[in-house]
A protein has these predicted regions:
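Conserved catalytic core of the tyrosine transesterase superfamily
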Residues: 1-268
């Protein structure tokens, strides 16, 4: 019964749908396998997670359990997160050269909608779920306001160069309102659809498929922004990060950049 109330509680929160689903699955899994939410069972569950999953996954599960403990007024039983070892380089980030190459190929081959998908992701720093929220009206306005997980408003800016070219494309297509990126059935395209299509383009144009996925372009936005305007506090705001510490990862080199520097510098 408490879990059903918890579901209703989450439904009224500002959490993403996938997060709510994940929280409910975790709490149900615990209840079925461990029963009562007491200290002994909670520590046993944490031990199971640590033994079988990566730290990031462990912390996601613990976050769900802690949210439920908060809900049933048992905050004192909250579990501590496990430490995640931070890598000293960024992995699988598309290079600026490959991003420009992909854009040029898509434009040349008349794949205009996908040309704009890639450009919007990289010029706005949008998460793919946020990209899907963009409407014609937002392009005309130059920005989109969204509510973040913490209930704050985050503004996603659409740069002038992108905005001007996108408006021309919209007018040529005769689109006057509604979501910008649609599938062949006239429905809003899905995150999975975008990811699959990007993999297809990577294969088609001879790019490393590990580098061509939606979030890679968000990483490229952050790297390019700091290269041109070194204000990490502003970047944190633009990306919707709760903490500036999350944004600091973009001060690091990518693995390929590190390799290039080592190859150039180390000659002994």
């Amino acid at each position: 019964m408490e879990i059903k109330k918890f579901e209703n509680f989450l439904a009224k929160s500002a959490l993403a749908k996938n997060t709510v689903t994940s929280y409910l699955w975790t709490v149900n899994h615990f209840a079925v396998n461990y029963g009562e939410f007491n200290k002994e069972n909670l520590l046993a569950y944490k031990g199971f997670l640590v033994e079988h999953f990566k730290p990031q996954t462990v912390n996601l599960r613990l976050q769900a359990i802690n949210k439920y403990l908060e809900f049933i007024k048992k905050d004192r039983l909250k579990l501590k997160f496990v430490k995640v070892q931070q890598k000293n380089f960024l992995e699988n980030v598309i290079s600026d050269a490959d991003y420009k190459f992909l854009k040029a190929k898509l434009k040349r081959d008349g794949l205009t909608e996908w040309y704009f998908v890639v450009w919007f992701l990289t010029a706005t720093g949008a998460r793919v779920s946020e990209l899907l929220q963009i409407k014609v009206e937002h392009v005309q306005l130059g920005f989109l306001d969204m509510y973040t997980k913490g209930g704050k408003i985050r503004r996603l800016y659409i740069p002038k160069k992108l905005r001007d070219e996108a408006i021309k494309w919209i007018e040529e297509c005769g689109i006057t309102s509604g979501y910008l990126f649609l599938n062949r059935f006239g429905e809003r395209i899905t995150s999975r659809g975008i990811a699959m299509q990007l993999k297809h383009f990577a294969s088609k144009y001879g790019l490393n498929p590990k580098m061509v996925y939606p979030h890679s372009f968000r990483h490229r936005f952050a790297k390019n922004f700091l290269d041109r305007f070194n204000d990490i506090a502003l970047l944190a705001d633009l990306m919707g990060h709760e903490s500036i510490e999350t944004t600091r990862i973009y001060l690091r080199r990518t693995a390929s950049e590190q390799q290039q520097i080592v190859d150039k510098v180390v000659n002994w």
